Design a protein with these regions (language model features):
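C-terminal motif of bacterial Sec signal peptides marking the signal peptidase cleavage site
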Residues: 14-17
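Sec-dependent signal peptide recognition
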Residues: 2-9
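A short, solvent-exposed, low-complexity linear motif enriched for acidic/polar residues
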Residues: 20-256
Length: 256
């Protein structure tokens, strides 16, 4: 009788263990990532470039002729703190539709994740001069006199200045630099990590990341294009404002 009870107990334990394994199993899937852009809710696409369609927080009427930026270290964080890297780096170009959407090459576990994050630009360790052939071919390099490495963002266009005359601007974000020349110095890091928050990964799911372009001109510092328009790369004060204003430019939308 005792042997029968022991056998029954072992059988139940094994069955419970097998069922637990099945419950804990997770499927894997590819995920589509899409990047969209807007100006305080008004969609910005390639078809809307070059027109004087946008007014920043200071009141400058402006156009956008080019917008491209670099993200790196795109990472999903599990609820237990473990991380999964989705993408090493990617150049996003609003004029190039193929850069705005892609499917992950590696399979990703389905389920809930506590955070999706990426670095805007490159960390200093990755920002190695001339190391990325694809970025070199895009003329994405920063001159050696400014520290070398790569741009974080290029946003170019025109605005109406105080004389109501069209004037160009080049809102180019790089690693903030002082003393351009043979021995430049770096007052502070100006790459930053964007934490988008919790996401749920489903079979053949889609993640949408949106940039509000207007944020680069308003929060926390109101940007007057009459004061800051060109030659911004060697201007560390301007670079630090870009760094601060960009913190709230990205959001996660319509995760499904």
């Amino acid at each position: 009788m005792k042997l029968k009870s022991l056998f029954l107990t072992l059988t139940l334990v094994m069955l419970y263990g097998c069922n637990t394994d099945l419950d804990d199993s997770t499927s894997q899937t590819t995920v589509s990532l899409k990047f969209t852009h807007h100006w305080d809710g008004v969609q910005v696409t390639n078809s809307g470039l070059n027109a004087f369609s946008y007014t920043n927080a200071f009141g400058n009427l402006l156009s956008i002729e080019r917008l491209r930026y670099l993200i790196s270290d795109l990472v999903l964080t599990k609820n237990n703190g473990q991380t999964i890297e989705i993408e090493d780096y990617r150049l996003i170009d609003i004029a190039n539709d193929s850069s705005l959407a892609y499917v992950t090459t590696d399979l990703i576990e389905t389920g809930s994740f506590s955070n999706l994050s990426f670095v805007f630009g490159f960390t200093n360790e990755k920002n190695s001069n001339g190391s990325y052939n694809d970025l070199n071919s895009e003329s994405w390099n920063v001159p050696l006199m400014l520290g070398g490495g790569y741009h974080y963002m290029q946003m170019d266009g025109k605005f109406l200045n105080t004389d109501n005359i069209e004037q160009g601007y080049n809102y180019h974000a790089i690693r903030a630099v002082d003393n351009p020349g043979d021995n430049p110095s770096f007052p502070q890091d100006t790459f930053f990590r964007v934490n988008l928050g919790a996401v749920s990964i489903k079979e053949d799911g889609e993640i949408n990341i949106a940039m509000n372009i207007a944020e680069w001109f308003k929060n926390p510092s109101t940007w007057n294009l009459n004061d800051y328009n060109q030659m911004l790369m060697p201007n560390s004060a301007a670079q630090i404002i870009m760094y601060e204003n960009g913190q709230n430019a990205f959001t996660l939308v319509n995760n499904n």
